[in-house]
Curated annotation (Swiss-Prot):
The lineage of its organism: Eukaryota, Viridiplantae, Streptophyta, Embryophyta, Tracheophyta. The gene is PILS7. The chain crosses the membrane at residues 9-29, 46-66, 74-94, 107-127, 143-163, 233-253, 273-293, 303-323, 341-361, 370-390. GO terms for cellular component: endoplasmic reticulum membrane. Residues 1-8, 67-73, 128-142, 254-272, 324-340, 391-395 are lumenal. It comes from Arabidopsis thaliana (Mouse-ear cress). It is found in: Endoplasmic reticulum membrane. Expressed in seedlings, rosette and cauline leaves, stems and flowers. This is Protein PIN-LIKES 7. Involved in cellular auxin homeostasis by regulating auxin metabolism. Regulates intracellular auxin accumulation at the endoplasmic reticulum and thus auxin availability for nuclear auxin signaling. It is a multi-pass membrane protein. GO terms for biological process: auxin-activated signaling pathway; endoplasmic reticulum to cytosol auxin transport; response to auxin. Induction: Up-regulated by auxin application.
Amino acid sequence: MGFLELLEVASMPIVQVLLISVLGAFLATDYCSLLSADTRRSVNKLVFVVFTPCIMFANLAETVTLQDIISWWFMPINVGITFLVGGILGWLVVKLLNPKPQLHGLIIATCASGNMGNLMLILVPAICDEEGSPFGNRSVCRSIGLSYASFSMALGGFYIWTYSYQLVRSSATQFRALEAAGLVKSPNKDIDSDPHALLLKPHQNQDLEIQGKQKVSTRTYIKDLLHQILEELFAPPTIGAILGFVFGATNWLRNLIIGENAPLRVIQDSVKLLGEGTIPCITLILGGNLIQGLRSSAVKKSVIVGVIIVRYILLPVVGVGVVQLAGNLGYLPPDPLFRYVLMLQFALPPAMNISTMAQLFDVAQDECSVIFLWTYLVASLALTVWSTIFLSILS
């Protein structure tokens, strides 16, 4: 496979995202006025409560069995490493560049969370279909590749709706607290850029001093922590993922809804149909937010460059090292396609679901759209270069 062929394959899912985003941006203009801010919020809630749980359940229940989970045990660890290392690098970007307070969680989340959904489902089978692919028989490669990609998508969704969800929510909560305390005057001013923001009025100092004297008991802290964990576990996308794992891993449940002779296959078909609305809706909302972001957002160029460096330079290098080390230690099956998927998980653009979270918590929506625009514009070239490197390593 030549560089130009790889560029074409890698560009297809990116171009799809950009085209649908342009449509969403047009629908949000004053000329069209179909995707107003209120409409985007309502559609976003549908994505969170209905579409995302459905796509996660449908993909997991259909493509992943108990044997697959056992055989591919390293993939959950690999995805966890991408989130852990990406989160650490994102935290360093925040510390070095000191962006606006409301962007802290967003930046860490975009550095940590890769788009393991539609991109993997398009890229992996496309690589299998090309002549000269190092992954053997085309039909076998495509079938196994789709299973790898679906499992990757489900794992990514699980991490995104627990780890990344918590990052964005915590950032939004902290920002609201700063606003309430008067430490932040407006969304466009940050503590360090405004010399008066740190100088509180006397009554504010007294209030904060009183608050500081109030000690929270250990029992209350543990209670709040457990409540927070349960809240994340019972988020609709997480429930969809858990149910998908249960149905996929339990043969008699799987046989009820999966397959031509399954008595309740209409349930799986209906859930799958609902799930197919996830990606178009998220992308349209992203495009709608982009219009407002280009008008009013002031994201530092250094922040965008920082996210791009983390996602397309540092993480892929770490990924090659992790996969090669795991292979040398005998932790991976001999299938080179499995190793390719593991490496690819480190080189993907940010997960689209982050824009859903930003909309859900009403924090940094415009900035999120601008960051996504630039990271996805760079993604085509980055994915092509890294796919070429990964294939050369595995050949």
